[in-house]
Swiss-Prot record:
Lineage of source species: Bacteria, Pseudomonadati, Pseudomonadota, Gammaproteobacteria, Enterobacterales
Protein name per UniProt: UDP-N-acetylglucosamine--N-acetylmuramyl-(pentapeptide) pyrophosphoryl-undecaprenol N-acetylglucosamine transferase
Pathway: Cell wall biogenesis; peptidoglycan biosynthesis
Superkingdom of the organism of origin: Bacteria
Residue positions binding UDP-N-acetyl-alpha-D-glucosamine: 15-17, 127, 163, 191, 244, 263-268, 288
CDD domains: GT28_MurG
Family the entry assigns: Belongs to the glycosyltransferase 28 family. MurG subfamily.
Species this protein is from: Escherichia coli O139:H28 (strain E24377A / ETEC)
Cell location: Cell inner membrane
Entry function: Cell wall formation. Catalyzes the transfer of a GlcNAc subunit on undecaprenyl-pyrophosphoryl-MurNAc-pentapeptide (lipid intermediate I) to form undecaprenyl-pyrophosphoryl-MurNAc-(pentapeptide)GlcNAc (lipid intermediate II).
Gene: murG
Length: 355
């Protein structure tokens, strides 16, 4: 499908969970001849990341309202109005055929600006429970898509766009069949790490002994303390790294993952075809729990919520999964994934632009 001459504006910001899926769709459409610009904020990760991907970015001034004091709430209508006015001026100059909202505060005024100019608004919700901005914008959107069932009652489930190197991994039955020796446990707390996993997993390693080998991503500034915790637990042989640059290689190495359940993490693990033990971050709206639930229901994962998390709970769960069980779970994870999510979102953007 050629997009020669078509213009898209992507609205996404704040966290990797919003920005990376937006980049995947942007690159897919650019390969079809689309022009793409980005709407973001100057003080969040998109300001650096998006230009590195060869996409020009325009900035508006907006920040979140949750947890702010009374003064900020009183000033909010004026701030939103000003951000809407900035976004409207940017869109009048760029003249996009369609805008794609991938979440983050920037999508709110951006979506309203597009709607007020008669530009189609397409939304994608990455999480299992809809964010505040997308809940508002869904009322005026041309098309609403969701990664997991349940965020919106009637929206099409299209999955989350996932990195191509993860999608290119061999299927679980090719990758895991015939593996022997200690079970390979990949521990991932996200880029910031997860203190609870950093504290718990060295003790789990001590309980499981040589039945497992662990690769533990500790997050920024925690590598030394986590290495020390493994050593003090009598388990110095396990690998601890601050970051993992090549997640596809880490997934290829692993037999099972112990991790948080951010939207992209869950989608990547399903696409890779890996069993998982999820420890959702305790959001007020239990967002990460709802992200992980479809894989638990599919028999591909287990959820242990943080209040129930203990060394014994993790150790007993991992010890109870034989290699045969892990392979079955891995196959179920892959079967539950939506590997063509990027194409599905891109196709809806194209349709909205032609409508």
């Amino acid at each position: 499908m050629s997009g020669q001459g078509k213009r898209l504006m992507v609205m996404a910001g704040g966290t990797g969970g919003h920005v990376f899926p937006g980049l995947a769709v942007a690159h897919h459409l650019m390969a079809q001849g689309w022009q793409v610009r980005w709407l973001g904020t100057a003080d969040r990760m998109e300001a650096d990341l998006v230009p590195k991907h060869g996409i020009e970015i325009d900035f508006i001034r907006i920040s979140g309202l949750r947890g702010k004091g009374i003064k900020a709430l009183i000033a909010a209508p004026l701030r939103i109005f000003n951000a809407w006015r900035q976004a409207r001026a940017i869109m009048k100059a760029y003249k996009p055929d369609v805008v794609l909202g991938m979440g983050g505060y920037v999508s709110g005024p951006g979506g309203l600006a597009a709607w007020s100019l008669g530009i189609p608004v397409v939304l994608h919700e990455q999480n299992g429970i809809a964010g505040l901005t997308n809940k508002w914008l869904a009322k005026i959107a041309t098309k609403v898509m969701q990664a997991f069932p349940g965020a919106f009652p009637n929206a099409e489930v299209v999955g989350n766009p996932v990195r191509t190197d993860v999608l290119a991994l061999p299927l679980p039955q090719q990758r895991l069949a015939g593996r022997e020796g200690p079970v390979r446990v990949l521990v991932v707390g996200g880029s910031q790490g997860a203190r609870i996993l950093n504290q718990t997993m060295p003790q789990v390693a001590a309980k499981l002994g040589d039945s497992v080998t662990i690769w533990h991503q500790s997050g920024k500034g925690s590598q030394q303390s986590v290495e020390q915790a493994y050593a003090e637990a009598g388990q110095p042989q396990h690998k601890v790294t601050e970051f993992i640059d090549d997640m596809a290689a880490a997934y290829a190495w692993a037999d099972v993952v112990v991790c948080r359940s951010g939207a992209l993490t869950v989608s990547e693990i399903a696409a890779a075809g890996l069993p998982a033990l999820f420890v959702p971050f305790q959001h007020k709206d239990r967002q990460q729990y709802w992200n992980a639930l479809p894989l638990e229901k599919a028999g591909a994962a287990k959820i242990i919520e943080q209040p129930q998390l203990s060394v014994d709970a993790v150790a007993n769960t991992l010890a109870g999964w034989s290699r045969e069980t892990l392979l079955t779970m891995a196959e179920r994870a892959r079967a539950a994934s939506i590997p063509d999510a990027t194409e599905r979102v891109a196709n809806e953007v194209s349709r909205a632009a032609r409508a």
